[in-house]
Structures are given as C-alpha cells and as structure tokens.
Amino acid sequence: MSRLNYAFLLVTLLPQISDAAAVEDEVSYLLGVVDNSDCRFVRNDISYSNEEFQQHLMSKWQQNEELISSAEDFIEKIATRSSISGSPYVALCGGELQIVKDWFIGLLESHRRSNH
C-alpha cells in the first residue's frame, strides 16, 4: 500500500477512533458516578443498589453498542427508561428523587466543562 493510501486511511479513521474513545470515556464516567454513589435506583417499580443498576446499564450498553455514537445516545437509548415497560429510571439520592436522564445530562455537562 502506498504512503498516500496510508495517509488517507489515517486521516479518515483517526476521527472515528477519537470519537469512539470520547464516547467510551464519557459513558464510563457516568457509570462510575453510579457505582460510587449512595443512591438507590428504581426500574419497573423495583429498587436496586448502585452496583446492580450500574451492572444493568453496562449490560444494556454492551447489548446495544451499535446504537450508541455519543454519550447523549447512551443516556437516551440506554439509561432513560425500561425497554420493557417504558417507565423512566429514577434515582433516590440523599432523600431526593430525580429522573436518571436529567441527572445524567447534568453530570455529563459538568464533566465536559471540567475537561475543556
């Protein structure tokens, strides 16, 4: 393969690799916050520990990886609601209920601000 072909491949593939790494970094950050939280998470009217909920989201992400091209996709397609019932995921943190989607959006925005 000529140098020109290598250069072309490099120029076309690097942004995709970089984007995929950024998505993985941001999603891993969100999952880490869940894992390190003292929150309880409700899905389909059942309460789960932070570890159980994090494992659920990781499993759901792995099963649907091809649908996720951004952290926003992860939030909307994986971490927002039950794929079975359509019910939103809810977090109980420090006595306050919050919708997981809203919590994750706030966390993501804060994470991006602190990294730029």
PLM region descriptions:
Residues 20-60:
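N-terminal secretory signal peptides
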Residues 16, 24, 30-32, 104, ...:
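Aromatic-patch recognition
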Residues 7-16:
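Bacterial N-terminal signal peptides
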Residues 44-116:
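Compact alpha-helical subdomains of small soluble proteins
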Residues 1-6:
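Bacterial N-terminal signal peptides that target proteins for export
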